[in-house]
UniProtKB/Swiss-Prot annotation:
Keyword Chaperone applies: no
GO BP terms in the entry: positive regulation of ferroptosis
UniProt-listed PANTHER family: TRANSMEMBRANE PROTEIN 164
Taxonomic source organism: Dictyostelium discoideum (Social amoeba)
Protein name (Swiss-Prot/TrEMBL): Transmembrane protein 164 homolog
Keywords: Membrane, Transmembrane, Transmembrane helix
Membrane topology listed for this record: Multi-pass membrane protein
Membrane-crossing segments per the record: 32-52, 74-94, 102-122, 135-155, 157-177, 193-213, 240-260
InterPro entries for the chain: TMEM164
Record has rRNA-binding as a keyword: no
Pfam families xrefs: TMEM164
Cellular component GO terms, alphabetical: membrane
Function: Positive regulator of ferroptosis.
Length: 275
């Protein structure tokens, strides 16, 4: 294990291109340990989720097939999708204006989830869109975190701050619209686990590697966000600690969004359609 840690640490050192003095806030050994164990943890979570889902699907084969949920076409869905698409495009322009390194920030969850929600809001492939939504609904926690503690220090270009808030409020609204007007899913633990497993691997594998290559702090994988009075969170364990906190919170908040969206659907849409 010690040799493996050394090899991974040296690999990170060889591909890294620092542009900030905090680039090595965590040691190469710390990065290597977390790269191995956190990715293993999230792979196990995905494996459990997939197997639970297979078991659930097998059990459902024996039951009568439910009547498919009705999709209520909504102009609001299209408006929110267009807003998200425009925001992603504007963010890409902003990043390109700052140089090739900054373009890697397009991997940030807000931009990826914006693209996913655009697809879910507009796709004609209802069944696949439903599965994608079952996974992506739990990422609303990232949106909430960004709105509660917005990091606007680097947003200096015209309209960039406004664009940030417009995008994130659209991201906040989108899951409720998708639940109320389109998919009306239920909380399913297998999909919740797959969701969090993918989220974790995107950080501790994909973001980790691209952070070293570009030198940019994608979703704070190199060094912590400005935490103010909570400076004790900036110790070496901040990534692991926040990862597990988000893991638990995402399941609870995702479930709450499902319940609220279903309530909106049953209270307003179904009653209005029955009149």
């Amino acid at each position: 294990m010690k040799y493996l840690i050394e090899v991974i640490g040296e690999t990170f050192l060889s591909i890294s291109d620092p542009i900030d003095h905090r680039h090595w806030f965590l040691s190469k050994e710390q990065h290597a340990y977390e790269f191995i164990f956190m990715n293993l943890f999230y792979l196990v979570v995905i494996f459990i989720g997939i197997n639970l889902n297979k078991k659930r699907e097998y059990e459902n084969q024996r039951k009568p097939k439910p009547i498919p949920e009705k999709d209520y076409p909504s102009l609001l869905n299209k408006i929110v999708a267009i807003i998200l698409a425009i925001n992603v495009f504007l963010n890409l322009i902003y990043k390109c204006l700052r140089g090739w390194r900054v373009v890697f920030f397009m991997l940030q969850p807000c931009h990826i989830v914006s693209t996913i929600y655009c697809y879910c809001l507009l796709t004609n492939n209802y069944q696949f869109g439903r599965k994608v939504f079952k996974i992506s609904i739990y990422y609303i926690l990232v949106t909430i975190a960004a709105l509660v503690a917005p990091d606007l220090a680097d947003l200096t270009l015209p309209f960039e701050c406004y664009n940030f808030f417009i995008q994130h409020y659209a991201l906040l609204i989108a899951p409720f619209l998708l639940q109320a007007y389109r998919y009306n899913i239920e909380f399913e633990l297998p999909y919740a686990l797959i969701s969090q497993g993918l989220f974790g691997i995107s950080h501790f594998f994909v973001f980790e590697i691209f952070c070293f290559i570009s030198g940019t702090n994608i979703n704070y994988m190199l060094f912590p966000p400005p935490l103010g009075e909570f400076s004790y969170l900036t110790q070496e364990s901040y990534r692991v600690g926040i990862a597990f906190i988000l893991f638990i919170l995402a399941l609870g908040i995702g479930r709450l969004v499902i319940l609220i969206g279903s309530k909106i659907r049953s209270t307003f849409l179904l009653k209005n359609k029955s009149k």
